[in-house]
Amino acid sequence: TTKKGKEEGLNVTVNSSTMFAAGYLRKPEVQTSYSSGSQGTYSTGGYVWGDKLDIGRTALQYDPYTHEWVDMPLVSKGKNNLKNFQELSMVTNNNVSVSQKGKYGSVRTSLTHVYNKGQYPNQKLNKITYSVSGDMKWKKFSFDGGLTYNKRFYPNDMGAGYGASGFLYNLLVWSGAEYDIRDYKNYWIKQDEQQNWMDTKWYDNPYFIANEIVRSSDYDLINGYLSANYDFTPWLNLSLRSGLDSYS
């Protein structure tokens, strides 16, 4: 709760806060004992009832470093693929406000920056808000007005939904634990032509999705108002009001 003071003069306020997100409260429970594939056989795709893991068996698998298919052990090295893909999520809020109050009026200005780092790579939001307002009263004339500017921009908001671009489904539901997602951070074999991934028919490398299949936004919003009033008599006054709304 903020209360207006009665004292005249200059007032400067600085606030800063940082919050960290704990991640998902609940996630689907999935098995990590069998590889991708079906009917007891390893293969890439959207099924996860392939060969048994961690019992000494091998299968022809994709090597993300040599970009070749080689015979490798079937082990559950990707049990924590979703967790290992996620990043520390945080929200930082910084605000500076300055106000001046005098005998006939007051003026206030404020600048706020909010930075939200998402839990997936390349997910972040920047929001800047600047506002200025003032009021004045002198004899029979009074005036007040304000202007607020909002700017919001982010590089990508993909990855949270259902489908081929959904990280939760790609890493937890539709793929097995026989690969480590961290081995695929270098998601290009040939820049802008061929991605580094074991199966591009069903879905893409999650790091490729995060950095290349992007849906960004950058917008500016301006709101303003102006009000003036003149009292001719206790029962007669003239009022003028105007507003501004701009979006780009």
Regions found by a protein language model. Name each.
Residues G105-V107, W202:
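Acidic/polar, low-complexity linker and loop regions
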Residues E87-K103, T112-V114, I128, P206-S246:
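Outer-membrane beta-barrel transmembrane strands
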Residues K6-G78, G118-Q123, T129-L221, S239-S248:
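Surface-exposed loop/interface segments of Gram-negative outer-membrane beta-barrel transport/assembly proteins
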Residues T1-T13, Q86, V91-N93, S106, ...:
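A beta-strand signature from Gram-negative outer-membrane beta-barrel systems
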